[in-house]
């Protein structure tokens, strides 16, 4: 959690880092999703450059232990992961709606900055339409809530009267 928190980027930082990665490593496309629960890099033509990219990111964040916390998902598995993220099937609370909005905001920022390239743009567009189908054709979002809402509901089950509880 400590490392994940230190990796959080605001939208401006995401795009700046995206430009740096695309230029430095001659990538065919870059998108960086950074939320309170995840920082993910969607990169095109990066498979033979991953060690150098991770090394650059360790320097960027001044985190020499970053490599130990990074995992990569490539090719079709990476596409499936993006679709799961967009559909909120890979969220702390299954079906929560925030991640799709965050992903759309990221898409807009990176598209406006001309960083997505010819592969990521249609891939993200398809992920959004798939997410819409998941939400409308399944029950995955029927009880979707935020993490904070879920925490309050759990607290209600644990304590008889929340008004008598102190939260720090």
Which residue ranges define each predicted feature?
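A glycine-rich (often HGG/GG-containing) alpha/beta subdomain
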Residues: 1-91
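Glycine/serine-rich phosphate-binding loop and adjoining beta1-alpha1 elements at the start
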Residues: 65-163
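Conserved class I S-adenosyl-L-methionine
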Residues: 165-168
């Amino acid at each position: 959690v400590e490392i994940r928190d230190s990796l959080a980027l605001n939208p401006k930082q995401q795009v700046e880092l995206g430009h740096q990665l695309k230029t430095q490593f001659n990538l065919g496309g870059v998108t960086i999703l950074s939320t309170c629960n995840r920082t993910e890099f969607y990169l095109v033509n990066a498979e033979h450059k991953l060690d150098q990219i991770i090394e650059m990111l360790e320097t960027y964040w001044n985190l020499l232990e970053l490599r130990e916390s990074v995992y990569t998902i490539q090719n079709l598995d990476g596409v499936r992961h993006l679709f799961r993220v967009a559909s909120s099937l890979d969220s702390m609370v299954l079906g929560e709606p925030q991640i799709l909005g965050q992903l759309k905001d990221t898409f807009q920022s990176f598209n406006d900055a001309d960083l997505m390239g010819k592969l990521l743009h249609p891939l993200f567009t398809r992920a959004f339409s798939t997410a819409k189908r998941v939400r409308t054709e399944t029950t995955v979002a029927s009880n979707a809530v935020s993490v904070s809402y879920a925490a309050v509901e759990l607290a209600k089950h644990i304590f008889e009267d929340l008004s008598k509880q102190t939260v720090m």
